[in-house]
């Protein structure tokens, strides 16, 4: 019933999906970017913390099904925060929310955490990397 997206790279995919399916498009944005009163959810990232917001006047019924689209799932914090904005403020059931990400970084555990929190998640591709090799290159560069 609704396509939602997380700022900003998710907009690229979600806008097209919403247009092609003729569905409303809801933006989850950084604080202060939306014109009306908002619901806010703070969360942790792999490198700090931040918040996202959704407008309070968004027309969402508790029975609506929502697809949340983003480009990447790493730790899962952003997607979970967005999903919780809908479950806590619009009384959307977790079973009515599907999180769709283009890329999954499974080594960081985000997709597993999303599933453990009770949300459905689908990804188009997984990108595995060897942390030991990554850190050896990183330390060599420094």
Predicted feature locations:
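Short glycine-rich phosphate-binding loop at a beta-alpha junction
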Residues: 1-7, 97
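Generic enzyme active-site microenvironment
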Residues: 5, 68-69
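Short, well-ordered alpha-helical microsegments
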Residues: 10-14, 107-108
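Short Gly/Thr/Asp-enriched flexible loops that form oxyanion-binding sites at enzyme active sites
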Residues: 12-21, 83
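Short, glycine/charge-rich flexible loops or terminal/linker lids adjacent to PRPP-binding catalytic cores
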Residues: 22-67, 138-139
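Acidic, divalent-metal-coordinating active-site segment for phosphoryl/phosphodiester hydrolysis
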Residues: 70-80
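PRPP-dependent phosphoribosyltransferase catalytic core
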Residues: 81-142
